[in-house]
Amino acid sequence: MYSLSLTDEDLGTIKRKITDFITNSIEDAAAKGATVALSGGVDSSVVALLAHDVADVKALILPELGVTPQEDIFHATTIAETYGIPYKLVKINDIINCLNTAKGLLELSGGENQKVIVANIKARARMILNYTVANTENRIVLGTGNRTELRVGYFTKYGDGGVDILPIGNLYKTHVYQLAAYLALPDYIIRKAPSAGLWVGQTDEEELGIRYTDLDKILVELDKGRSVDQITRDLGINKSKVIEVYNRVLQSKHKLEMPPIAQVWD
């Protein structure tokens, strides 16, 4: 976990462990197979390909027309067709419009948080579709979140975080890129700028305010129990940026936990 540089032997072991995990999870749920939201990005492509190796997988491609880049739709469909993964493409515009209308009926303005509120609605709409397919066809929902995103809370609670299992949730983003190359995924998937596609022109690194390479280095050191001062000194990264990452990790812990239960019995 503490090394960001993996050998081919490491990657082979990781692939086996993840595919075994997927297989066992499907069997434990007495499910027919799995479903995964395929965005055209590296995380979902890696998960889809690993799952397809060992299970009956259906991919859902869920663009918002006018927001999701056509390139992403093309990449997602190309990955599915190239590797023979059955898929369904569903435009989510009407669903989002309905949910936004409901928000209006509740007389909620959103204020300065409007962009984030709408983005969360989109992520939760996709979650609803994932589970509609999963429930109808007796599948489990595969999440595509990686360790980097999970640690800093870069996902929507009960949105893209609403899944049954997280096959790559133990891998930092840096690891995911290495695994993608090991699996021989196309360069156009590996080299594209990561984006959640929640608004026009959105990119992960711009929203996070830090490059994934630096973010992963900080997270690895935090996982080792290093202090902010030690990390700042050893990595040569601005202290304010290290503190920002540290605070995000603390503030997003609730996203990784089940809701607290009030204890009423002695």
Which positions does each model-derived feature cover?
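ATP-dependent adenylation/nucleotidyltransferase module used to activate substrates
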Residues: M1-V152, I231
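Peripheral terminal appendages
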Residues: M1-V36, V42, V46-L50, V54, ...
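Predominant activation on well-ordered alpha-helical scaffold segments within soluble catalytic domains
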Residues: T23, A48, H52, T77, ...
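Residue-level marker of structural boundaries
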Residues: D56, G104-L105, D160, L185, ...
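Short hydrophobic/aromatic-enriched beta-strand-loop microsegments
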Residues: K58-L60, D164, V242
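Catalytic subdomain that performs nucleotidyl-dependent activation
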Residues: E81, V118-K122, R126, R139-D214
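Generic alpha-helical structural context detector
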Residues: N97, T156, Q178-A181, V220, ...
